[in-house]
Curated annotation (Swiss-Prot):
Lineage, uppermost ranks: Bacteria, Pseudomonadati, Pseudomonadota, Gammaproteobacteria, Enterobacterales
Protein name per UniProt: Dihydrofolate reductase
Its EC number(s): 1.5.1.3
Every DHFR domain range: 2-161
Leader sequence residues: none
Gene: folA
Organism of origin: Buchnera aphidicola subsp. Acyrthosiphon pisum (strain APS) (Acyrthosiphon pisum symbiotic bacterium)
Length: 161
C-alpha cells in the first residue's frame, strides 16, 4: 500500500489560515488535480469544510470525522485507520489535509508531493517539519517563476523514502 501526502506549503510551512488556503495559484490546482485524479483521497473534517463539503470529482473521497457524515459521494471514517481500510488497496492513497492528519500520517507516508510557494505568510495551520527526517529523497523538482496568473515563485517537488 502506498500512502502519499500532497500539500502546498509556504517557506514557513503554512498550509492554511482561518480554514482557507492563503494564496491562489492556478498551476498548483492543476498539479493537485493531476496527482489525485482517479485515486483515493483522505481528508480531515476541516479540509472537507474548506472545500465547501463537495466531493472532488473522479476521486474516492474519504472524510475523517468523529461525527458521522452522510453525504453522497463521500465515505465517512471515524479514524485514520478506518479511512485507510476504506481505501482501495491497489491504488495510491493521497492524504490531502489538514494539518493534524498530515502530522499523524507523515511517519507512514512513502511519498510527498509538495508545492513550495516562495513566501513567508501568516497562518494557523502548518505542514509538519518533514525535513527533520533525513530519509526523504527528492525524485523530482521543477522551479516555476511567477506570472500573470500565478503571483508567486513556486516549485513542485516529489520526495520518496
Amino acid at each position: 500500500m502506498n500512502i502519499s501526502l500532497i500539500a502546498a506549503i509556504s517557506k514557513n510551512l503554512v498550509i492554511g489560515y482561518k480554514n482557507k488556503i492563503p494564496w491562489y495559484l492556478p498551476e498548483d490546482l492543476k498539479w493537485f488535480k493531476q496527482k489525485t485524479i482517479n485515486k483515493n483521497i483522505i481528508m480531515g473534517r476541516l479540509t472537507w469544510e474548506s472545500i465547501k463539503k463537495k466531493p472532488l470529482p473522479m476521486r474516492k473521497n474519504i472524510v475523517i470525522s468523529s461525527n458521522e457524515i452522510k453525504q453522497e459521494g463521500i465515505i465517512w471514517a471515524d479514524s485514520i485507520s478506518n479511512a485507510i481500510i476504506s481505501a482501495q488497496y491497489n491504488q495510491e492513497i493521497m492524504i490531502i489535509g489538514g494539518a493534524k492528519i498530515y502530522k499523524e500520517m507523515l511517519f507512514y507516508a512513502n511519498k510527498l508531493y509538495l508545492t513550495h510557494i516562495d513566501i513567508d505568510i501568516v497562518g494557523d495551520a502548518y505542514f509538519p517539519e518533514y525535513k527533520l527526517y533525513p530519509y526523504w529523497k527528492t525524485l523530482f523538482r521543477k522551479k516555476n517563476t511567477k506570472n500573470k496568473m500565478n503571483p508567486y515563485n513556486y516549485s513542485f517537488e516529489i520526495l520518496s523514502r
